[in-house]
């Protein structure tokens, strides 16, 4: 398990329940952080949750957000603007950068970012077609490798 997403329920016209309180979300995020190994990230979706109010409970990942696409799972809830995400990340000390859907520890060593100081997951975690895409000698492979190194085009970190 590389991450656990603590996603609140957002009621709609077909539901009869209420959105959980901020305090309930804070307790849930904190319990996830305590219960999970340190190597497992705790994520909250910033378009569905009061992210700023949850960061100090153990959130270390803001999720797969996009400045150019909608949230396909929750299309009624737009992603926060990139500037807002930068501000939220800065306030929490959580780096904001473009990343692959797989965390560094699961990447083969040759694809990990320089300075990776975590514990590599044992074994092989990526299917051959994914490794082939990362290895590709074309613009796509180059882009994937750049994102893995954290020097992708959407790098907005301040020196991570």
Could you describe each region identified by the protein language model?
Residues 1-160:
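Auxiliary Fe-S-binding modules of radical SAM enzymes
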């Amino acid at each position: 398990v590389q991450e656990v997403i603590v996603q609140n329920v957002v009621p709609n016209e077909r539901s009869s329940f209420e959105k959980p309180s901020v305090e309930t979300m804070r307790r849930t995020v904190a319990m996830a952080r305590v219960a999970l190994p340190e190597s497992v990230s705790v994520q909250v979706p910033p378009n569905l949750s009061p992210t700023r109010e949850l960061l100090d409970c153990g959130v270390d990942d803001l999720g797969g957000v996009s400045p150019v696409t909608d949230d396909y799972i929750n299309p009624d809830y737009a992603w926060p603007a990139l500037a807002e995400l930068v501000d939220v990340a800065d306030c929490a000390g959580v780096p904001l950068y473009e990343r692959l859907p797989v965390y560094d520890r699961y990447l083969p060593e040759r694809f990990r970012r320089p300075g990776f100081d975590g514990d590599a997951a044992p074994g092989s975690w990526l299917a051959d077609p994914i490794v082939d895409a990362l290895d590709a000698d074309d613009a796509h492979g180059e882009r994937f490798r750049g994102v893995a190194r954290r020097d992708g085009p959407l790098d907005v970190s301040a020196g991570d």
